[in-house]
């Protein structure tokens, strides 16, 4: 029984410790850092009603799609980002839906 508990705990620790794909360069324009409340993979996004809101070819979308984003600058001194912090320097579309953003690790 102890062995099984140890194995389950080790596997759970490994799952929690697995890193997300983060930016490899440390540069991100501060105006490009956003706090996004919603993220979904591109395939799920393509099937959603939100996909009709963007003026690009849906077939070109890959990776993660972020929405309900607000600038981090607007959060300083107020509430913190309790969702996903992303850098949108190379975003294909920047507005209601953000495509091409990269998750970043920021302690706010």
Swiss-Prot record:
UniProt-listed SMART domains: HYDRO
Coiled coil: none
Reported biotechnological use: Vmh3 can be efficiently used in surface modification applications such as antifouling agents, in modifications of biomaterials used as implants, in designing drug delivery systems for water-insoluble drugs, and also in food foams.
Disruption phenotype: Alters the cell surface structure and mycelial hydrophobicity. Exhibits relatively slower aerial mycelia formation on a liquid medium and leads to slower growth under stress conditions involving SDS and H(2)O(2). Leads to a marked delay in lignin degradation on beech wood sawdust medium, while the production of lignin-modifying enzymes is not reduced.
Residues spanning the signal sequence: 1-17
Induction of synthesis: Expressed throughout the culture in cell wall extracts, but increased when the aerial development becomes prominent. Expression is impaired by carbon source limitation.
Keyword set, alphabetical order: Cell wall, Disulfide bond, Glycoprotein, Secreted, Signal
Localization in the cell: Secreted; Secreted, Cell wall
Glycosylation sites: 37
Cystine crosslinks: 28-87, 35-81, 36-69, 88-101
Gene Ontology CC, one term: fungal-type cell wall
Keyword Transmembrane helix included in the entry's annotation: no
Domain of life: Eukaryota
PROSITE patterns (UniProt xref): HYDROPHOBIN (PS00956)
Membrane spanning stretches: none
Pfam families noted in UniProt: Hydrophobin
Molecular function (Gene Ontology), one example: structural constituent of cell wall
Its job: Aerial growth, conidiation, and dispersal of filamentous fungi in the environment rely upon a capability of their secreting small amphipathic proteins called hydrophobins (HPBs) with low sequence identity. Class I can self-assemble into an outermost layer of rodlet bundles on aerial cell surfaces, conferring cellular hydrophobicity that supports fungal growth, development and dispersal; whereas Class II form highly ordered films at water-air interfaces through intermolecular interactions but contribute nothing to the rodlet structure.
Similarity comment: family membership: Belongs to the fungal hydrophobin family.
Assembly description: Self-assembles to form functional amyloid fibrils called rodlets. Self-assembly into fibrillar rodlets occurs spontaneously at hydrophobic:hydrophilic interfaces and the rodlets further associate laterally to form amphipathic monolayers.
Name listed for the protein in its UniProt record: Class I hydrophobin 3
Protein source organism: Pleurotus ostreatus (strain PC15) (Oyster mushroom)
């Amino acid at each position: 029984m102890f062995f099984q508990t140890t194995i389950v705990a080790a596997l759970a620790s490994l799952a929690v410790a697995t890193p997300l794909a983060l930016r490899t360069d440390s540069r991100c324009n501060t105006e490009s850092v956003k706090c996004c409340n919603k993220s979904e993979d591109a395939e799920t996004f393509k099937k959603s009603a939100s996909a009709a809101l963007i003026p690009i070819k849906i077939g070109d979308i890959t990776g993660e799609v972020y929405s309900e984003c607000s600038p981090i600058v607007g959060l300083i001194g107020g509430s913190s980002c309790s969702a996903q912090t992303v850098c949108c320097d190379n975003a294909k579309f920047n507005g209601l839906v953000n495509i091409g953003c990269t998750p970043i690790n920021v302690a706010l």
